[in-house]
């Protein structure tokens, strides 16, 4: 201890901190998806176990309502959501090849790795969409 009023330096040893070992995290496995899905749906399935897909015509008023309801149902059920414009061949072409003709509006529910678990041709309200997601989640193997 120093005497008050002196300018002596304190003597002591410096304690060097021990370096912490680097934490190595396991690299996540890539998610394998079924081929033939639209790129937007595949991207959503990489982030979410279940994804709601809404097929809509932007020029049809009822399709806009259906799109909003499907989005709300997906949000309530904590699922991914993908709107696909039926007037854009690049977006809907892969689904048409898999499912044949799909009317608009339509709501599809997919589960990883790309399995279609629910399909609603025509209007589906938010409660119906949310319940379909909940049912699909409960049936997940």
Could you say what each language-model-derived stretch is?
Residues 1-48:
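N-terminal leader/targeting and pre-domain segments
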